[in-house]
């Protein structure tokens, strides 16, 4: 039944997006999850990661990275091309995690995810750095924008209100390109246009915790997830 509900919801979103105008449109919320009960936690499904533990604590979804793993990713039930996702994420302070690894940890939002590829907003709580990046199916990363000394990024145990949108441009010289906008605490901190948007065929929306290094024991919480689409009205 869960698979059927997800499929129906995805078809509904696809139908609504057929009438949407893309970048620059007003947005309407189609999914919200405050992670307050087992039913809401169960709506979040694993997307990728070799050894990842999930749970719930004090009204939040928890992620713990396991042995020989660099990143753990999860998705919402919403599938679509032109979406915006927002969430409040916290990097947990873990004394057992080496300081060099903890410093390299990032909190991320993912759009157009599938087959290992995705657009990603990666925020580094201990470096005050934000990146918009394009991850391809072979694991290579194209950095579309990198911003340092970003005000508003909280450190370990601090809430980070993140938001990422990816909308295809529907007219003009850049028609077919994806416009990506990234926000921290309601402030626009990074943006990019990707003329190679067609390279990503995935449609999943979600979030990740990761590091460039193996990060056994690292953890994060995720709360107040919202997904929006361009309004067709």
Each predicted region: which residue ranges?
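Carbohydrate-binding surfaces in secreted/extracellular proteins
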Residues: 35, 87, 155-193
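Short carbohydrate-recognition loop motifs
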Residues: 49-70
